[in-house]
Amino acid sequence: MTVPLEAEGLIGKHYRQLDHFQVGREKIREFAIAVKDDHPTHYNETAAFEAGYPALVAPLTFLAIAGRRVQLEIFTKFNIPINVARVFHRDQKFRFYRTILAQDKLYFDTYLDSVIESHGTVIAEVRSEVTDTEGKAVVTSIVTMLGELARQDATAEETVAAIASI
């Protein structure tokens, strides 16, 4: 396994997403339905309050919504040689410092921790340190993505744009 030529010098690079991600009540509910998480704190503010929270509680994997956008941005900004139209998550880890709640504004500081290539496959590890408006840690997300080495593909840019718009 080797570091792709295009990725040399990128390891350890930092990217701060320009805007925050606003956690919305309805997005929490929609996501909880999608992942079939029926815990009442995701749907009912009274249930969340009774459980000790001031707002709806996001499911543990809710961060994936904002994380996907950040990952696409970092692959584009750093020109990582991976075909993002044909990539999947190999692994994802979260370290929570507090619960994500409705109305949170989340800020992402993202780092490219590693990129390796072997036999036409690229493995990239991306870490995001997520903070709130006060700069306090909310969660650390570490995602390992696996995909084919980027090649010129006539439809790749259209596919990436479609994925980014979701």
Curated annotation (Swiss-Prot):
Pfam families with a match to the protein in the record: FAS1_DH_region (PF13452)
MaoC-like domain residues are: 10-131
UniProt cross-references to HAMAP family, sorted A to Z = UPF0336
Instruction: Tell me its family.
Output: Belongs to the UPF0336 family.
Q: This protein is called what?
A: UPF0336 protein ML2425
Organism expressing this protein natively: Mycobacterium leprae (strain TN)
